[in-house]
């Protein structure tokens, strides 16, 4: 039974290994970062408070460097450099102040610290993202949450179990979401709502069904009365459409369903394609909800297709002929790129398709199979999982530097990451 479940879920991720192509493209680019000095000061002489402020400042520096736009350096005191940030603590109020040559210091944000590092870490992430946007016009990405499936096979378990967890980009603030004692997979942030809702698939009723949970209410609610297996949900906030795959008619087909996050499905689901278009999977909306990218093996090999949905669903078109064994497409938040996986020289790599130019390129090159790329809000960074059938870890990769960093979490298989729950950044750009 476990093999059958795995086949259903991982079809588009693993089937493409059979058709490996001799393709390899390495892209290199130069980028320029903006130097900025970061210092901290406090009016207290308590050494514990001073040490704690230093810890927060260190986190802040890592956060603003994450976006690959700013190059922070720690300074022991406020300097006269052209651009600097000062973290000023008047217990319990911490202010983040912008210092520029010949200009009046500007407080970009301030908040109350609790001296609970887990709580204050999130506040620092939010402050760093505020500064990042103010200085660059590009959203900061340190305050987002990564939701993923963490699974293990215990000695007394016949079937693999997996719960959903969340973590920060650096592996900190790791916390469980579900406690269903079942297999929960493919979580996806919805992208709207102050309680940060997410969709996922759970096997707790025996067959996979789609559920809706949130950071405030982790007890998921089944969202569709549709019969059969339901997989790979994704949501368009703009169009209030839920896309998913179901085998209601025997074949794994692509469906769309008008859906309200508060009241549930509106009307009946619509089957977009039938068995003549092969097995379909991995749907992903563009930001406007007017188009859908997905995978189909109608030509024998899993390939990427795009379907326009406005004003009515139209015939899908093949996205790229270069990569014939593809899976896991993910449309970027800016609508300009699609990340996907493809087998290259026997290894599943992450590739990027540029919609404006029609060009695509290979992003990763390491000899480990990758899957499930998910975009940060800046459309310049991805989280993905990499490993094999028995083990898998989470990684971040920058499209700017092409560098990859492992998220150190601990034991267990980490799969299906989704990067989201980014707080709003209302501040205007300063520079």
Swiss-Prot record:
InterPro entries: 6-blade_b-propeller_TolB-like (IPR011042), PD40 (IPR011659). The keyword Transport does not apply. It holds the Pfam family PD40. Residues 1-20 form the signal peptide. Transmembrane segments: none annotated. It is found in: Periplasm. Keywords: Periplasm, Signal. One of its GO terms (cellular component) is periplasmic space. Belongs to the TolB family. NCBIfam families: PRK01029.1. This is Protein TolB homolog. It comes from Chlamydia pneumoniae (Chlamydophila pneumoniae). The gene is tolB.
